[in-house]
């Protein structure tokens, strides 16, 4: 008799995706982040659901409802901080996942890569709207500043911003719609993640060497299921250390002050995971130019496959490209630091140089160095 997991219509899908899936025998821990992102998403949906049971999306009561969750709801504080810090874990995994893709040439699977970019943008939108919900000072002013960027769009900008706000400023209507979108988007992310996997399983996983591994596959279960569980436990450990020992480490103290449209905080800045993009935005003195640079800083990922000039897929055997990659990582860390600093000398200049370097590495240096490596190898 055939095993039920191979015949049952539903079990068959799970079997072919997580059990009998042929996987490369040499994928490293860098391949763990896909499953970790799945775990993050599930944690965020569950904690978010329980928070939504007690949260009110009204400007007069939103801040108090979050306080009520932390003080009066059974284990509300841990649910709230798991959700807030879970977002940080989500972005850590996202950045490492994208970094892995850049390093090992995973972008050579165009459908998987492009859906990944859409996922990244959707998660960023979700996180931004979630940050507005507690209705603290940074929530309100963050929402005001970021939505205002759309007014840089010629001709329709102002109308567009007022349409998104649902009025002439960030107010009750804005908060309500942001809550609605923040609730629905994770389920859209879930669907996109399923499509992401669907396309990945059409080609099979890449591996560190970048060489096709069809001649050497192993079953996903038990080898990679146990590896993924270990990764998930380590991530859960890190998350709970953050939640239980320093839950506000990554947050902004200004968000413990209720939103006040009449008083602007001295330094408006987003959560840490947006700082690199915020630094690029601020480094251009023109509003529209800054918005375009901000957009392009993420959308540049979509043209990475077109800029691949190397004869090899992975950077495993390309030391010069590796130097460029780690220079890019260092540059992103500098941008993240600059995004959290006030707009004054010397931070302005550092931010501008780091922004120029970011685009130069991706658009010019990496493709050029790949060609040099091809020539050195006489390929």
Swiss-Prot record:
Gene source species: Taxidea taxus
Q: Which Pfam families match?
A: Cytochrom_B_C (PF00032), Cytochrome_B (PF00033)
Protein name, please?
Cytochrome b
Q: What else is known?
A: Heme 1 (or BL or b562) is low-potential and absorbs at about 562 nm, and heme 2 (or BH or b566) is high-potential and absorbs at about 566 nm.
PROSITE patterns per record: CYTB_CTER (PS51003), CYTB_NTER (PS51002)
Residues holding heme b b566: 97, 196
Q: Where in the cell is it found?
A: Mitochondrion inner membrane
The protein's job, in short, is:
Component of the ubiquinol-cytochrome c reductase complex (complex III or cytochrome b-c1 complex) that is part of the mitochondrial respiratory chain. The b-c1 complex mediates electron transfer from ubiquinol to cytochrome c. Contributes to the generation of a proton gradient across the mitochondrial membrane that is then used for ATP synthesis.
Q: Which gene encodes it?
A: MT-CYB
Q: What family does this chain come from, according to its entry?
A: Belongs to the cytochrome b family.
Origin superkingdom: Eukaryota
> Which residues take part in binding heme b b562?
83, 182
Upper lineage is: Eukaryota, Metazoa, Chordata, Craniata, Vertebrata
On whether Transmembrane is a keyword of this UniProt record, the answer is yes
**GO BP term, example:** mitochondrial electron transport, ubiquinol to cytochrome c
Please describe the quaternary structure of this protein: The cytochrome bc1 complex contains 11 subunits: 3 respiratory subunits (MT-CYB, CYC1 and UQCRFS1), 2 core proteins (UQCRC1 and UQCRC2) and 6 low-molecular weight proteins (UQCRH/QCR6, UQCRB/QCR7, UQCRQ/QCR8, UQCR10/QCR9, UQCR11/QCR10 and a cleavage product of UQCRFS1). This cytochrome bc1 complex then forms a dimer.
- Identify which cofactors the protein needs according to its UniProt entry: heme b
